[in-house]
Amino acid sequence: MSSISTGRTALRSARRVVVKIGTNALTNATGRFNRQHFDALGQDLLWAAQGRELVVVSSGAIALGVERLGLPSRPRDIPGKQACAAVGQSRLVQAYEEAFAAHGKAVAQVLLTHEDVQERRRYLNVKHTLERLLTAGVVPVINENDTVSVDELKFGDNDTLAGLVAGVVDADALVLLSDVEGLYTGDPRRDAGAELLATVMQVTPEVLALATGTSSGVGTGGMSTKVRAAARASDSGIHCVITSGAVPGRLRAVLEGADVGTHFEPTGSRRSARAAWIAHALRARGTLTVDAGAREAIVTGKRSLLPSGVRGVEGDFGRGDPVDLVDAEGAVFARGLAAYDANELRRIAGHRTADIEAVLGYRYLDEAVHRDDLAVL
């Protein structure tokens, strides 16, 4: 039996859990839906739902659509993938309904695109809906809306989606189930000497390098997307474990604190809902290069970014759009909402606050990015 490490004991008391199930955890070697395997996963999920609030982020719609349409392989073109997703999504949700209904649990289908969390009002609508479902004892089954999302079909976005959802619902734990045991020092399919990393204290560039290039042929995600999702969760104070969904009882072992898979320790504290939205739900539309003094004031002093600290502006963005803040070396250290558009910031960059009106002829705010609209990464 697996032992229990000190760092994982918090998983035993996790009350709100997000579980992401990858395509490869639902299909066999030929890419077909594996009913026996799904039933075993269903038992794990039912156990997890007892005494906990459970959210399931599930891949598999495209693979099920391929099977239902009798296609020899997964389409490579976007319309083909979207058609398969449209056919397969109903079958996927039906499978979850049958698994949970036998034990009196209701499920709710929730289809999301990145745009649903990009805009603040829609983000809050998603959050409030999921909160209401969980309060009612319903298990939300969430999937990327592949039928209408073009960009999201290009890579393993359900890993990213699961990380975002974990932040939206303020989860205690995120479990990413795949067809591999966790993060290895090499690709275990090619390197017999690759060793499993039991614990990752912080996702560094070296850790991300280990994840690069590990993927499979049925789903769209690889280890890189999983590690990045784990990093987002960890940064928000959420425990994350990447492990195999192909092993019966593995989810239960994770939530009992056993040493299985790769555990990503939380590195940050719980963010406010607004800070979490800025940090993880938004996609930057531009970049502001800041000087060392401004970086120190933001990171250590929790201060706003003033125009005087801006050294460069890249991109074409409007007021209120998300922008990344980078240091002189180009490293992103914060994300925020711009108080001025790109052209305005180019004109006032390096100027004192008192000079803004003289340069522009008007002044909206004293800051380039207000501290209430900033999230340090």
UniProtKB/Swiss-Prot annotation:
Signal peptide: none
Disulfide bond annotation, renumbered to this chain: none
Catalyzed reactions per annotation: L-glutamate + ATP = L-glutamyl 5-phosphate + ADP
Domain PUA: 285-363
Tree of life domain: Bacteria
Keyword Translocase attached: no
InterPro entries: AceGlu_kinase-like_sf, Asp/Glu/Uridylate_kinase, G5K_ProB, Glu/AcGlu_kinase, Glu_5kinase, Glu_5kinase/COase_Synthase, Glutamate_5-kinase_CS, PUA
Entries under Pfam families matching the protein: AA_kinase (PF00696), PUA (PF01472)
Membership in a protein family: Belongs to the glutamate 5-kinase family.
Protein name: Glutamate 5-kinase
Originating organism: Myxococcus xanthus (strain DK1622)
